[in-house]
């Protein structure tokens, strides 16, 4: 192997290694622990799931395989319409992860895009929890 080929090989290997480190670090914030609960943050998982004005990430708090609560994270939805969706966040409280995944709450009239996005965020977050707990 020539010196130039060797440098090229090691340069590519170093870039691949850095990409792996960055991607591993990138997902470290999806599942965390707060106050003895497992918390799934859907910000990175659901960038493509949009409400009316953009993404609507949530934090899902889980303890002993039960959903304790779902919190909306900062988003760009119109506050007037997003306020209609807030009661939906309680739909999963107290349910086991399996029951929460199987449940299908009704879309909120007048905030269809936002409520649909919240439901999809919770679904993706709970599936991620099941796959990575």
Model-derived segments and their meaning:
Residues 3-11, 19-116, 120-133:
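Flexible, solvent-exposed loop/hinge segments and secondary-structure transition points
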């Amino acid at each position: 192997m020539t010196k130039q080929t060797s440098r090229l090989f090691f340069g590519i290997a170093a870039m691949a290694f850095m990409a792996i480190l960055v991607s591993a670090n990138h997902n470290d914030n999806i599942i965390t622990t707060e106050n003895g609960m497992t918390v799934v943050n859907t910000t990175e998982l659901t960038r493509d799931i949009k409400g009316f004005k953009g993404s609507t990430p949530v934090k899902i708090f889980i303890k002993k395989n039960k959903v304790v609560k779902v919190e909306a994270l900062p988003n760009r939805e119109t506050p007037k319409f997003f306020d209609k969706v807030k009661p939906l966040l309680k739909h999963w409280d107290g349910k086991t992860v399996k029951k929460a995944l199987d449940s299908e709450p009704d879309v909120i009239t007048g905030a269809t895009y936002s409520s649909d996005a919240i439901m999809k965020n919770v679904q993706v977050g709970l599936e991620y929890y099941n796959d990575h707990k």
